[in-house]
Structures are given as C-alpha cells and as structure tokens.
C-alpha cells in the first residue's frame, strides 16, 4: 500500500473570538487522501471544513496534530518550506476561482508556474497539456471572462 498523498492526524484548531472566548473548530480531526483519490468533504456550515482544508493546504496551522503531504511531515516546517510545498504539491479550486479575467486560460495557468521559477517554454507546454487534459485546448487563447463557469473551474 502506498503512503497517502495527504494525511492529517489528530488535528486541533481553536480561534479566539474575543469576549465570546475561545472557539474550538477542530477537535482531533483525521483526514486522509490517497494519491489519485477524489474526495468530497461534506458537513454542515460552521463544522470546520474550510479550516481543515486551509490546514491541509498549508494556508493555516493546526494548534496540534500531524500534517503530512506525500509522506513529508510539515506541522513544524518553516514558512518558506510550507510555501515551497504549497506551490509544488497543493492546488485548490475555490467556489469563486479568482482567475484573472483579462488574461487567457493559458496565461492564467502559466503565471503561477513562472512565479515558481519554471522557464516560460516549459510553463506554456505544461499549461497546454493541462488544458488538453480538461478538454479546453481549443479555448487556451480565450480570455477567462469569455468562458462559462464550468470552463473557468476547469482552468482553475
């Protein structure tokens, strides 16, 4: 059996809510995603889904517990290491995808790769391959503002 791509174990997270005191959002949460697995995280509003995903995506830190991406423990990683791992290994598709509407689908995919140090030709080739994979190769040069919501999600 392969190591999971993502493993969160015994995750605890609380927020200080001022006069209301401390609010415990996660209390011993466990979450595992195997490589290639598609997972839906479904729970009532306020249950801690976004907090759990922000911890999994290294956008937030747990008060305690273990966070591993591709077998690498990251709960004590430096900000720089968390940023490197997030850039290379983590992707989110938000309900609101935050694409740059004046840029093409290809440009929206190329820009973050350039920011991560990938050479332009390689970033363009990778963007084109990804667009082909999600059946948007013919729309690569179209501005995302001209695309449907579903097409925008696939670009994101």
Language-model-detected regions and their locations in the chain:
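ABC family nucleotide-binding domain
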Residues: 3-156
